[in-house]
Amino acid sequence: MLEVTATDTAALTGSSPSSQARRYQAKGLVDEYAHDDAVRLLLGTVATTAARLDKVVTPLLALFDGHHVRISLLVQTSKSEATAIGKSIGWRVRCEDVPYRFVQHPDPEALKHASGPMWIGPMWHKEIAGRMTEERALELCHPNPEDIEKGRNAGLVWGDDDIEHSAREVRRGVRYIAEAADLMSRDHLLLSLDALPRLCKVGGAPKMEKLLTALTAAGHNAARYPDLEPMLVTDAPFDAVVQVVQATSTSSDRRVE
């Protein structure tokens, strides 16, 4: 197991292009995918470094969390898999017909609208991330009444507000992870809720829960993605997302071209 935390988010997201180029030999675009790009860039850096040592990594969980990026990886020795690391490294190219595509070798024109090189493989481990529910986190990380009483007897100054705040922070730390675990362990489409009006030509973004319910009803998998911004992840093709978004918008919300 390898746990890596990086705090140089300006470099990882590309908001500091010179730092990004110097530290990670990468090029970024600062848009709704900057946080995901930061996670993938760190994953790619660790994966390629490991490959030089005949090691291969399997991401277990990778998140942009406030002012840092956290990744958890399983590291194993395998010369053959380390040699094939190139299949998991590529670029995210912003496109006109879809929000983005992952490609391994963008042409010079596409490179103008691309960020990378970065990890383009699965981001999470389905079973491990799927166990990170709020209930399990509270069970493991939040003190029970007996522990709190022992602490108070030892001088801990903790009132009911402190207990509630602690529980709230524990929940926040794992919120949405279990629900998104399956999708994040395979090919998926990541979308910013705030970008959907522009992408789908509607006047306003639908409510997150309404959109997730509609996508599920249409036969797709969809979940909220844990990020500072409202993001969702789905296995629906983008044209299906557009249809669902337009169908859940009222006629007055439609943009006139």
What is each PLM-predicted segment?
Residues M1-E257:
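SAM-dependent transferase fold signal centered on methyltransferase-like domains
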